[in-house]
Curated annotation (Swiss-Prot):
It comes from Oryza sativa subsp. japonica. Gene3D superfamilies: Zinc finger, CCCH-type. Pfam families: zf-CCCH (PF00642). The lineage of its organism: Eukaryota, Viridiplantae, Streptophyta, Embryophyta, Tracheophyta. This is Zinc finger CCCH domain-containing protein 63. SMART domains: ZnF_C3H1. GO terms for molecular function: DNA binding; mRNA binding; zinc ion binding.
Amino acid sequence: MAAAPSAGGVGEGSSSSAAAAAAAAAATIGPHVVDEEAMWQMNLGEAMEAGPYPERIGEPDCSYYMRTGLCRFGMTCKFNHPADRKMAVAAARMKGEYPQRIGQPECQYYLKTGTCKFGATCKFHHPREKAAIATRVQLNALGYPLRPNEKECAYYLRTGQCKFGSTCKFHHPQPSNTMVAVRGSVYSPGQSVTSPSQHTYPGAVTNWPLSRSASFIASPRWPGHSSYAQVIVPPGLVQVPGWNPYAAQIGSSSSDDQQRTAGGAQYYTGSRHSETPNMGDQGMFSSYQAGSVPLGLYTVQRESIFPERPDQPECQFYMKTGDCKFGAVCKFHHPKERIIPTPNCALSSLGLPLRPGEPICTFYSRYGICKFGPNCKFDHPMGTVMYGLATSPTGDVSARRMLAPVPAHSEVSPDNVSGRSRRITHSDSQQIPSGERGTEREAS
């Protein structure tokens, strides 16, 4: 009975001795660790205090101090610590002084533009001798930098503008001619006129001396009345036979066709258009022969706003249509002398291809024009005009029959193609519109 308590006392004493040993170990290790951490935190606190820092005139500014206002090295720092840090940063930016940190990578933005938005707080090296060369970059006519060894600015090539201005690191090629941008479209400025009666065109583009006889030809890209400024042509008005913007691209096989085309000639003037019944009364209009330029020859533009880049590929859209929506900022080549390929089909009086077996050109069916001209791969029917023109001696008989004018119900008219007389059949009468059919019933 007496031995049990002694055993329990022995066990209890051993556990207490173990706890005492652990406490002694903690006492020997804990304070040392605590003191080391406290000393580290104290050193950091002392280093980050806004205490006095050495001003070393002539030495580079302490970059960490310039950014944060603190310095962990304190009085032992070998760099300069201006008393008024904010004022020093502002003065450095105004003077264009940037830190020279030999051994650090060079600031690429500073080398290309001569400026640095971080100023004295930038952690990279800013060599002054290289910056002097970079700041002498040449500017183009629009005020954007010319950097031939760099890539071309894609945004500038598309829009003609660059939001980075003279600080852009890419190349901005010189525009070929002086341009006037009107709502995203580029036009060459109007030519001065020697006529005594001049006035200023009160449109989107001002201060253009123009004659009262100046003509306005709408661009084929914007049919009808458009919100875009129309192209202004010099006083020698260009006659457009039968609303034909492709007159210089088509040839006529007979003089009769030229006379017919000239008889119904139309002009684009300051108003929408005015018809001229004959060519005898021309007035101030200059003479112009339709189809005077044969097919397959060179057509030379009198004034072009499209750039010539011989070392670049040719602009395919320009080679097909003679137009380019990018204007003077297009990065492809636009030769002044453009070979007009000879079309492999007959052309209408508008200079558009007649392809009876192909689908009808959607743009032509809506607006009556086609920007692709003779190179369009779709059909451009003339409505009631037959395909059997002088330029198409071997036309399709079915197409002629469908497009030939339909005579009255009880009349017999000669067939313009075969020379035979025929009476309108039931199938032909089904093609007559309901309005004409009702008119025929009333007439009968």
